């Protein structure tokens, strides 16, 4: 299973559990931050050929929209939680560099900024634009994309 960092393409910041702990509690917000460390590594956990869980390696918790709804509202915070269900499934669109929730919305920096500050929350939103592009990169080389569906 490939380990990767989730990099906000426009700002170069990365997904982190808020507070940066290795075992954050259920419901911990996911934020963007410029630091790189082993507590912000992720992996895909395959469910079927398209949909996957995004797993926080250190805690083995899964990326979820807060509340775990099938069709989260625009602005719903992204969090880590231990539960695995179809409302926590995501797919990567490598052509457009976005992360799509099974309900159809995408992960965005809250506020839609191309250069969000450290600690900016990540949310679900239906809009598509350059500020919501993410790429998966190697923890050993933050400029090298990794093949995460292999």
UniProtKB/Swiss-Prot annotation:
Residues at which D-galactose 1 binds: 16, 19, 35-37
Biotechnology section: This protein may have potential in cancer diagnosis and treatment.
Residues that coordinate or bind D-galactose 3: 108, 111, 127-129
Glycan attachment sites: 26, 74, 118
Claim: Glycoprotein is one of the keywords in the record: yes
Ranges in a coiled coil: none
Residues the entry annotates as binding D-galactose 2: 64, 67, 83-85
Example of a GO biological process term: detection of bacterium
Annotated disulfide bonds: none
Annotated function: D-galactose-binding lectin. Binds both alpha and beta anomer of galactose (Gal). Binds strongly to branched beta-Gal-terminated glycans and weakly to unbranched glycans with alpha-Gal on the end of chains. Has strong affinity for both Gal and GalNAc. Binds glycoproteins containing mucin-type chains. Has hemagglutinating activity towards human group A erythrocytes. Has hemagglutinating activity towards rabbit erythrocytes. Agglutinates V.proteolyticus bacteria.
Protein name: D-galactose-binding lectin
